[in-house]
């Protein structure tokens, strides 16, 4: 690629480019004394950015065709990337137009497909806490919540396990979280600052737990760094408290989903 192709765009978009394409191209630019078009520009690697969605959306792999298939895009006609590597080796020997068209056709589909999967960034709002809680209810066993997103999801989805279940469609997320005797787990991000107390099934800050016998405490992990609170009327009537609860806890719950 020539530098002028990147000039109008301050951020360049790619899929797996930060680990593969960019280092490869940078090495070639240096070898042939060509100015790098990446200098001074930020990058958005969709593979790395969207990777957390794999289990949530039940994606079989984070390959671009898999993401396109999830979005309902099924108009690819050229060979996949693995086949194109073989085709390229054949092309170096034969230099025939048909093989060249196959390779270029695949590359064109990949480039155009980047724009199509760009909409999947909207699902990250669920992880980032970028939503509003619009409804809450406790049915005696489960906490039921509705969340409003700032964007429209490109495809509806559903997923869950024995602890929770969620669905997403358009701009709304429906969430059901199972309670234990009317109590919920509040997870914390800074788990390295806590001790987990197995006998009490809760955590305590290390600053307060240093005096507890080592037999009764462990270093907390992402999965064990939580305390319990009652799903009270005060909690159910406070969207602010509900948002505080969900901001990190929802990501932890999603992290318990099994990959396909």
Task: Give, region by region, the residue ranges found by the protein language model.
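DEDD superfamily 3′-5′ metal-dependent exonuclease/proofreading module
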Residues: 1-260
């Amino acid at each position: 690629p020539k530098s002028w192709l990147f000039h109008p765009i301050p951020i360049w978009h790619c899929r797996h480019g930060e680990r593969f394409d960019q280092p490869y191209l940078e090495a070639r630019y240096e070898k042939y004394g060509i100015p790098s078009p990446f200098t001074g520009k930020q990058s958005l690697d969709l593979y790395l950015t969207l990777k957390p969605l794999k289990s949530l959306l039940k994606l079989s792999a984070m390959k671009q065709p898999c993401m396109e298939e999830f979005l309902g895009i099924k108009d690819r006609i050229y060979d996949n990337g693995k086949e194109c590597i073989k085709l390229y080796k054949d092309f170096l020997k034969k230099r025939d137009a048909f093989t060249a068209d196959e390779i270029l056709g695949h590359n064109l589909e990949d480039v155009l497909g980047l724009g199509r999967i760009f909409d999947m960034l909207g699902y990250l709002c669920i992880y980032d806490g970028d939503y509003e809680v619009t409804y809450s209810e406790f049915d005696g066993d489960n906490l039921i919540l509705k969340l409003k997103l700032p964007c429209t999801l490109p495809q509806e989805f559903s997923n869950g396990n024995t602890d929770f279940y969620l669905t997403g469609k358009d701009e709304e997320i429906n969430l059901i979280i199972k309670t234990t005797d009317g109590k919920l787990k509040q997870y914390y991000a800074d788990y390295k600052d806590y001790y987990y107390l197995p006998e009490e099934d809760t955590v305590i800050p290390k600053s307060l737990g240093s005096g507890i016998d080592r037999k009764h405490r462990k270093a907390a992990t992402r999965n064990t760094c939580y305390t319990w609170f009652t799903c009270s009327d005060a909690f159910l009537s406070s969207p602010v408290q509900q948002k505080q609860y969900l901001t990190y806890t929802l990501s932890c719950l999603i992290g318990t989903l099994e990959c396909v």
